[in-house]
Structure formats: C-alpha cells, structure tokens
A protein has these predicted regions:
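Hydrophobic alpha-helical packing segments in soluble, helical-rich domains
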Residues: 14-17, 44, 51, 55
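Short, highly charge-biased, low-complexity peptide segments
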Residues: 81-89
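Alpha-helical scaffold segments that form or flank carboxylate-/histidine-based iron centers
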Residues: 36-49
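N-terminal intrinsically disordered, cationic/polar leader segments
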Residues: 2-33, 37-38, 76, 88-97, ...
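Mid-chain, well-packed structural core segment of small domains
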Residues: 50-82
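Short, low-complexity intrinsically disordered segments
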Residues: 22, 48-51
C-alpha cells in the first residue's frame, strides 16, 4: 500500500482527535489570520487553529489534486513544545501527529 493511501486516514484520525478534544473550534479565524507568512502562522493563529484550518485542508487538497506531497514532514515536535504544560487532554492528538510524521519517514 502506498504512503499516499495511508496518509488520508491519518489526516482523518488527526481531525477526529482534534474534534474529541477541547481544542476544536467551530468558528473560522478572521480572514487576516490566513495572510501570515510565518511558519505555522505562528503570528496569527494558535497551533490548533493552524492544524484545523490550514494544515488539514491543505493536505487533503494535495491528495485530492494528486499534487506532490512533502518529501518530509515533522510537525510533532512543534506541537509537543506548543502544548507543553497545557491542561487540555492532547495525548491522542499528539499520538496521531506522531503516526502521520512516521508515514513520511518510510
């Protein structure tokens, strides 16, 4: 089974973990937040906003269009640091991010 075929279920698992946590947001950030030029939109969005509103949709769009996927992916370290010390239950989300990163190491 190709990596691309396994990526979409991993993205859905990340979304499911995000929805099951208190981090899921029902309101889209302001349009200006999407104009960021910074990695992870760190200057305009929280990590969970970037994951929900930027990363997941862009990855699905790449898969839908058949466009090349990133050769490497390592977003888990960012989220481990960003969520350090938070009281939210993010364990399952971090687990699913770890799974996705591992798919890009194959």
């Amino acid at each position: 089974m190709s990596v691309e075929i396994r990526i979409r279920p991993s993205l859905f698992a990340i979304e499911h973990a995000l929805r099951a946590s208190p981090l899921w947001q029902s309101s889209v950030p302001d349009e200006a937040a999407f104009a960021s030029q910074e990695p992870f939109f760190i200057d305009t969005m929280t990590p969970e906003q970037w994951l929900q509103w930027v990363f997941l949709p862009r990855m699905h769009a790449l898969l839908d269009s058949g466009a090349p996927l990133p050769a490497r992916l390592a977003i888990l370290p960012y989220f481990e640091v960003a969520f350090e010390g938070r009281s939210d239950d993010v364990g399952e989300l971090l687990t699913q991010l770890r799974v996705l990163d591992a798919l890009f190491e194959e």
